[in-house]
From Swiss-Prot:
GO terms for biological process: cell wall modification; pectin catabolic process. It comes from Brassica campestris. It is an enzyme of class 3 (hydrolase). The keyword Coiled coil does not apply. InterPro entries: Invertase/methylesterase_inhib, Pectin_lyas_fold, Pectin_lyase_fold/virulence, Pectinesterase_Asp_AS, Pectinesterase_cat, Pectinesterase_inhib_dom, Pectinesterase_Tyr_AS. This is Pectinesterase/pectinesterase inhibitor. Residues 27-178 are annotated as: Pectinesterase inhibitor.
Length: 571
């Protein structure tokens, strides 16, 4: 007999002829369900979901779980619609806005679940190479539901909606746990699910093979086509080194031929960026390339979920500027997510040589300059200016290089796997008595998901307005927005504006007790570890932070872009 299975305990015995051994009894079904649900956060709910599925085949059980999760999210979507309808005329503008947003992101979750089920097919054994991507989509499904609740400010509505979508969140959470167990087991056994059925257990590879398997000989991702690499490389000032300045310098079309040109003076096809986005095709296998000529464009821009693979580039981060002033504090009917000047809902977004601003000011409270919900976002040589929640790295995998980002409260925040490399991070002067927090990660689940913010080889300083008061205005590296917040600061210059304790607690919560904060090989007066909070880890060796490198944190594709920029895969 050949043992075919994974370390979560779901083991099927198959003889050489491919026939199943053992009794096909209810007992075997119960054991399979018990083993599959062993990794779930809510084991009781997991078992209850799978009890009607009279099979001990892991593929059938997992697919049944996905379908049950999809059904639960559908019910959550319907519940949201009925809640909105029930509130009727009693509903204020903000409640309507947030419920509309909830309906939208729940539809995103449904679309991703449909994709997951389709990609899984009838036999999980054929999905081995896709497991990490399936898990990434599942993480998004969970995050979308979390987004809905996070955006609700009104306590009673928050309570009602929290209870209304509770079941679908539990199932989504359990689904992530199951896929995490599968991918972890495959990694430990160094075997793909589709290899297991054939008995091709293979030889033990070098430790990093699985992590780097999607990179080519130059250390660049195979998923990123030669055409895309050329686009990013050519979308800059001709003859200039791509690392010229940090978020500054020239841009321009270079040798690239854009699909659409935006110009305020009418010399392009469109005068607004939103018009150009509307002209991009949905579900595009290629690139929609939008060149935005120098100018200040005051508009809110949303890239819809179905309008994927959009690449925007401008004439420089201080020359091509997209700006708006929508905020939670000053704009009726606005939530954090809806305040974003630019909102990217789709996968495969790229940007270069553009400035993004939210000018609501410190009194606007949450006021996002740039929000990304889509997976595989790549941003080079851009600038992000705001106050609270400037850069909302909300979902998926995101890579930033040579950017400037400025703000006050939680100004780099979200629920994604994000690496910001070789960038300038500026704390600003907010309202009197206001405290600055550079990061606020929103990871809600434990080890099963790869979510967190990594600052690598950056500079954290005070901007010009804060400079004189930098020692009296309290500034911290971050605080935990959610229970399992994860942030790493590596090889970074930290100015003296940062408090000696380094990190702060979230007021009224004990998230710091379960959060993960790591520092390694930093420099500057603000990097002294002597007075750091006891719950932050001061790593002593590279091995302790290896998991936060680009090659490891942004798997499976690793997304290193050529783009005329030197990219560090490792430390």
């Amino acid at each position: 007999l050949l043992v075919v299975g994974v370390a979560i305990g779901v083991v099927t015995f198959v003889n050489k002829g491919g026939g199943a051994g053992g009794d096909k009894t209810l007992n075997s079904h119960q054991k399979a369900v018990e083993s599959l649900c062993a990794s779930a956060t809510d084991k009781g709910s997991c078992a209850k979901t799978l009890d009607p599925v009279k099979s001990d085949d892991p593929s059938k059980l997992i697919k049944a779980f996905m379908l049950a999760t999809k059904d639960a999210v559908t019910k959550s979507t319907n519940f949201t619609a009925s809640t909105e309808e029930g509130m009727g005329k009693n509903m204020n503008a903000t409640s309507k806005a947030v419920l509309d947003y909830c309906k939208r992101v729940l539809m995103y979750a449904l679309e991703d679940l449909e994709t997951i089920v389709e990609e899984m097919g009838e036999d999980l054994q054929q999905s081995g190479s896709k497991m990490d991507q399936l898990k990434q989509w599942l993480t998004g499904v969970f995050n979308y539901q979390t987004d809905c609740i996070d955006d609700i400010e009104e306590s009673e509505l928050r309570k009602v909606m929290g209870e209304g979508i509770r079941h679908s969140k539990i199932l989504s959470s359990n689904a992530i746990d199951i896929f995490h167990a599968l991918t972890t087991a495959m990694s430990q056994m160094n075997v793909k699910v589709d290899d297991m059925k054939k008995g091709n257990l293979g030889e033990t590879p070098a430790p990093d093979r699985d992590l780097l398997e999607d990179l080519d000989q130059k250390g660049l991702p195979k998923w990123h086509s030669d055409k895309d690499r050329k686009l990013m490389a050519q979308a800059g000032r001709p003859g200039a080194p791509a690392d010229e300045g940090i978020g500054e310098g020239g841009g321009g079309g270079g040798k690239i031929k854009p699909t659409h040109v935006v110009a305020k003076d009418g010399s392009g096809q469109f005068k607004t960026i939103s018009e150009a986005v509307k002209a991009c095709p949905e579900k595009n296998p290629g690139r929609c390339i939008i060149y935005i000529k120098a100018g200040v464009y005051k508009e809110q821009v949303t890239i819809p979920k179905k309008v994927n693979n959009v690449f925007m580039f401008g004439d420089g981060a201080t020359q091509t500027i997209i700006t708006f002033d929508r905020s939670v504090g000053l704009s009726p009917g606005t939530t954090t997510s809806l305040s974003g000047t630019v909102q990217v809902e789709s996968e495969g977004f790229m940007a270069k040589w553009i400035g993004f601003q939210n000018t609501a000011g410190p009194l606007g409270n949450q006021a996002v300059a740039f929000r990304v919900n889509g997976d595989r976002a790549v941003i080079f040589n851009c600038r992000f200016d705001g106050y609270q929640d400037t850069l909302y790295v909300n979902n998926g995998r995101q890579f930033y290089r040579n950017i400037v980002v400025s703000g006050t409260v939680d100004f780099i925040n979200g629920k994604s796997a994000t690496v910001i490399q070789n960038s300038l991070i500026l704390c600003r002067k907010g309202s009197p008595g206001q405290t600055n927090h550079v990061t606020a990660d929103g990871k809600q689940k434990g080890k099963a998901v790869k979510i967190g913010i990594v600052l690598h080889n950056c500079r954290i300083m005070a901007d010009k307005e804060l400079e004189a008061d930098r020692l009296t205005v309290k500034s911290y590296l971050g605080r935990p927005w959610k229970p399992f917040a994860t942030t790493a600061v590596i090889g970074t210059e930290i100015g003296d504006l940062i408090q000696p304790t380094g990190w702060n607690e979230w007021q009224g919560e004990k998230f710091h007790l379960t959060a993960t904060y790591v520092e390694f090989n930093n420099r500057g007066p603000g990097a002294n570890p002597a007075a750091r909070v006891p719950w932050a880890k001061m790593a002593k060796s590279a091995a302790e932070v290896e998991r936060f490198t680009v090659a490891n944190w942004l798997t499976p594709a690793n997304w290193i872009q050529e783009a005329n920029v030197t990219v560090q895969l490792g430390l």
